[in-house]
Amino acid sequence: MEFTQVILYTDTDGRARFREQAIPLTEGKPQARLSALMPCGGLQLRMSPVGFRSEFHCTGAPQWLFVLGGMMEIGLQDGSTRLFKPGDHFYSADTLPEGATFDAQWHGHCSRQVGDEPLVTAFVRA
């Protein structure tokens, strides 16, 4: 049994992309499988109003993002988007490559609130 981790990362060309990776659920009991315990550096909650839209940016530090309410769309520089609904998650690790100067036409991702409900998210620092 495994958990699918959606990862937003910086590829070798400096662009943000999505990929998926399996996290094995090898602990716990047959009726409640668990992953290995993962360290974290803190929890932060955010509420974004209807109409929220960010500029392109990179993640400052790797973190899990869990959508608790509303819907969120993540847009990449290649024009692709991915929609996240309540209960969805992704691991945001699209940090600026070392030595690079941020270029809003090349690096990072943007996010926006979708629909008629505020976006409520939880960030868990890795």
Model-derived regions, located:
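Short acidic, Pro/Gly- and aromatic-enriched capping/linker segments at domain boundaries
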Residues: 1-9, 79
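A short glycine-rich, His/Asp/Glu-containing loop-to-beta-strand
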Residues: 12-56, 62, 117-124
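Short acidic (Asp/Glu) patches
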Residues: 49-52, 70, 76, 96, ...
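Glycine- and acidic-residue-biased ligand/ion/polar-headgroup-sensing regions
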Residues: 60-78, 88
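Ubiquitin-like/PB1-type beta-grasp interaction modules and other compact soluble beta-rich domains
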Residues: 61, 80-83, 101-107
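Short acidic-glycine-tyrosine-enriched beta hairpin
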Residues: 78-96
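A short hydrophobic beta-strand segment most commonly corresponding to one strand
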Residues: 91, 100-126
